[in-house]
């Protein structure tokens, strides 16, 4: 795919998610099932057969990570080293700034499903599509949240043809 095709697909997916839909999104770490509303997240949980004790992850870039995560200077340097210098994807689990305007937009149900003891998971640097949709999310001030595109406990899917029909 060309960079323009990736950008166009990211815009289409973001618009669907922002309007209450759910996207099956290609990431370097496998396909993800992403929503942005409480209802879409509930639908993801029900479709996957996910237990309520499992939390969602947020989708974001390094700028989002710098704003949302409360990291020590050493931890922030390590995050940048791994994702920017070594170009590795990372699910950063860290305390977050619950007073950040984006996190304050979460309703109580979404917060219960995505934040535990002031900590979130933020997926950073998971490929070109992830970069494009993360940028759109940050620019629009609209959080993207979800998990892997599979039935619960069935393993990550790296090919769209391996995603279960229920998903």
Task: Please provide the spans of the model-predicted regions.
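Active-site-adjacent structural elements in enzyme catalytic cores
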Residues: 1-167
């Amino acid at each position: 795919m060309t960079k323009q095709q990736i950008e166009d697909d990211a815009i289409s997916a973001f618009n669907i998610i922002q309007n209450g839909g759910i996207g099956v999104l290609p990431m370097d770490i496998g396909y993800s099932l992403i929503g942005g509303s409480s209802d879409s997240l509930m639908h993801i949980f029900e479709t996957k057969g996910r237990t309520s004790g499992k939390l969602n992850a947020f989708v974001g870039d390094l700028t989002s990570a710098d704003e949302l995560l409360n990291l020590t200077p050493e931890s922030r340097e390590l995050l940048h080293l791994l994702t920017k210098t070594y170009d590795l994807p990372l699910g950063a689990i860290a305390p977050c700034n619950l007073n950040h305007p984006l996190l304050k937009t979460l309703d109580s149900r979404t917060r219960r499903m995505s934040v535990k003891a002031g900590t979130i998971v933020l997926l950073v640097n998971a490929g070109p599509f992830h970069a494009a949709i993360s940028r759109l999310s940050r620019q629009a001030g609209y959080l993207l949240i979800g998990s892997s595109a599979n039935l619960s406990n069935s393993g990550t899917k790296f090919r769209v043809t391996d995603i279960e029909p229920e998903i």
